[in-house]
Amino acid sequence: SDGLFSFSVNVNRATANSSDQLLRTGRRTVSTSVRDNAEISVVGELPPQTAKRISDSIKFRAAQ
């Protein structure tokens, strides 16, 4: 939660079936994006545009 919205972020390795998706049911949004061989899902009671901004803001570091 950021104090305004309640949401969860999940990051998994992308598969061949992974694709960008957006689902809005009532106040709940499920936004999935695929980037850098990762599938990023944001789930919560927030606007779709906010879910997209959250997933776009995630940065990956190289493994050490």
State the predicted function of each range.
Residues 1, 58-64:
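N-terminal "mature-domain start" segment
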